[in-house]
Amino acid sequence: MDSPFLYNRYVTGQHFIGRKEDCSIMANLLAQNENVAIWEPSGAGKKSLVHQVLTKLKVRGEAFAVGEMTALDIRSGESFVKRLGAAVIRLVASTPDEYESIVKTHLEGTHWVFDRKAFSDMDMILSTNWDLDDRDLKAVLRLPYSLAAEKGERSFLIVDEFQNVDLADDGERIFKLMEEVMDEVKAEGLRIFSYIFIGSQVNAMEDIFIKRHFFYRRVTRLKLSKVDEREIVEHIIKGFLASGKVIDRDLISGACRLFKCNLFYINHFTSVCDSLSKGYIMEPVLLEALATVIAVNRGRFISMMNDLTSFQVSLMRAIIDGYTKFSTAEVIRKYSLNSSANVRRLKDALMKKEILTFVGEDGKPVILDPLFEYWLRNYYFKKEQ
């Protein structure tokens, strides 16, 4: 039987809760052929929201095609462009003859070819017969627009873990070429294709889109709202009732606060509770479920801390102790942080590791992973009795 608490894949329909306004905003952006970027920590529900919106558009009878690719393992710009091209070609074609026809027609005069042996051996749609230049790359980056226009149907391409393109030596080159193509097709009136960029590395995505201003006025950021705790509690109670189980509302509210309404952790936690219980679910079951979820993630958390320098660990300790300003003489002395210049370097390093981010005008530190924060507070930095 399907579990009501899904955490191993994105969810839509009855399993999707909250964020009605976010769904409405995204649907409107896509209707206006806008490019959308969503970045939130892992487990926040980014892909669930995207697919919920697309599902609702389908139900409303809207016709469109959706492609999906990941940049998770991308370490070169050319690899990204090649994968992007293959993803959009597969949107409109499905046979080697069709692939070859598209490459010959739309990429004529470039160094891209369709190699039947490469396709047979490695499922590779785009191969090259020479070193690629900017003209070659732009030709592929134009493909989504030209193919959508040729088919006469709106198309979307979901690019997951988009921030990893910036790990490539030529990442900035790819961003600039994408910007050029976006501007060119807009001037030509080819507004029938949209990107949906998704990123789980919050600081890396902000660096691309906000600090360095790539895709300025070309991509709209959709910041996900927090799912209301009451909606989560109701969803969990109904989920347990469906299997004849009862759980105290206050206990679930406490779990929501512990996980800071992170839907991945909450669904994992309640799924474990479900597997451990029959009938009325008491507090010991929740404690056992919490211990199980922590045990699953403990190795990852230890590895994260082992990867930090002593200074970085000290700054994390200061955050757990409740400090938000770290350049004062008191905090520098208490946590042996050396100097305010060193504090700046430590903050930058922890942001690059995607452990921290800083929000608001006062730059309040936020630990991005709520379970990691709980583990730090209650295990790693636990005060001696």
Regions found by a protein language model. Name each.
Residues 56, 272, 349-352:
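Alpha-helical DNA-recognition elements
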Residues 234-299:
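Amphipathic alpha-helical "lid/sensor" segments that cap RecA-like P-loop NTPase cores
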Residues 2-5, 299-385:
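C-terminal leucine-rich, beta-strand-based interaction scaffolds used for sensing/assembly
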Residues 1-41, 56-59, 371, 382-385:
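A short, basic N-terminal segment
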Residues 149-151, 164-170, 174-211:
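Sensor-1/coupling segment of RecA-like P-loop NTPase cores
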Residues 32-35, 39-44, 48-156, 165-166, ...:
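P-loop NTPase nucleotide-binding core
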Residues 209-225:
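A short helix-turn-beta junction within AAA+ P-loop NTPase domains corresponding to the substrate/partner-engaging
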Residues 160-162:
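Walker B catalytic acidic pair
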